[in-house]
Regions:
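An N-terminal structural lobe/cap that precedes and organizes the functional/catalytic core
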Residues: 1-89, 95
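Short amphipathic alpha-helical surface micro-motifs
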Residues: 3-5, 56-58, 111-115, 191, ...
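Intrinsically disordered, low-complexity boundary segments flanking structured domains
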Residues: 21-26, 116-118, 197, 204-206
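Internal, well-ordered alpha/beta segment that forms a basic, Gly-enriched binding/recognition surface
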Residues: 28, 56-144
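C-terminal, charged low-complexity interaction regions
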Residues: 144-221
C-alpha cells in the first residue's frame, strides 16, 4: 500500500471541493471548465489505493482512499494538461528510486563479489518543477500566500506559476536541494511526505520539505 502524508499547520490543509479559480490563471488562456487535479500525481503509485494522513479529515489516523479521492478543482483543463510533462518527470524519478531499491535488495542477498556499476539519470529540472507544482497544489486556497511575491492568501506568485510551466527559472539560491548525510537511514517505499516552511513574521509559504520515496528534498521558494 502506498502512503501520502501531509503536514501543514492546523486548519490549513485539506481536500478541496467546489468550483475554484485556476491557480495558473495569470498565464491566460484558461479553459472554461475546471479539471480535477491530483494533489500528488497518481502516476507515481502502482496501486489504486493510498494510505493518507495529516489532512483535515484524517489528522489523528491513517485512512485508506482511492487515488481519485485526492483531487481538487484548482486548475482548468488546459493548464492541467499543460503540466503533463512535469507529471511524467516526477513519475520517472519516483520509478528510478524504486528500481534502485529493488536492485539493492537483490544484491544484498548475493554473495560478496564484483558488481557492475549501474548508473541512473533523472530529469533534475523536471523534478524540481514537479515539487513546485505539488507544493502549490497542497497549499492552494489554504491560509498563507505561496512565495515571496504573492499577495493573495492561498495563491502562488506569478513568478512561481511561470516556473512551474517552464516559462521561468528559480533565481539566486532558490530551488531544489537534496538533503542527505552519512549514515542517514532511508526507507525507500511508495511514500510521499510533505511539510511546508512557513514564514511567521510575514506569514507566507517560503518552501517545503519533501520525503520522496525515502529521499529527502528541500524546495526553497
Amino acid at each position: 500500500m502506498s502512503d501520502i502524508q501531509g503536514c501543514l499547520e492546523k486548519g490549513h490543509l485539506g481536500i478541496y471541493s467546489g468550483s475554484m479559480r485556476c491557480w495558473a490563471a495569470c498565464l491566460g488562456d484558461c479553459s472554461d471548465k475546471m479539471s480535477r487535479e491530483h494533489l500528488v500525481s497518481a502516476s507515481l503509485f502502482l496501486e489504486g489505493n493510498l494510505k493518507v494522513q495529516g489532512f483535515d479529515w484524517c489528522k489523528g489516523e491513517t485512512v485508506e482512499v482511492g487515488i481519485a479521492g485526492l483531487t481538487a478543482k484548482i486548475l482548468c483543463v488546459k493548464h492541467n494538461n499543460d503540466l503533463s510533462p512535469i507529471d511524467t518527470a516526477g513519475a520517472q524519478a519516483f520509478a528510478t528510486f524504486r528500481e534502485i531499491r529493488r536492485l539493492a535488495n537483490v544484491r544484498e542477498k548475493q554473495k560478496p563479489g564484483y558488481r557492475n556499476v549501474k548508473r541512473y539519470r533523472i530529469d533534475g529540472i523536471g523534478l524540481e518543477r514537479w515539487f513546485l507544482k505539488t507544493l502549490i497544489n497542497l497549499c492552494c486556497d489554504r491560509g498563507y500566500p505561496i512565495g515571496r511575491g504573492s499577495q493573495i492568501v492561498g495563491r502562488p506568485s506569478d513568478d512561481l506559476v511561470r516556473i512551474a510551466y517552464s516559462l521561468g527559472s528559480f533565481r539566486d539560491k532558490a530551488g531544489l536541494y537534496f538533503v542527505a548525510r552519512v549514515g542517514m537511514k532511508i526507507e525507500s517505499t511508495d511514500t510521499v511526505i510533505f511539510a511546508p516552511l512557513v514564514q511567521k513574521d510575514v506569514p507566507r509559504v517560503e518552501g517545503g520539505l519533501f520525503v520522496f520515496r525515502g529521499q529527502s528534498f528541500l524546495l526553497f521558494l
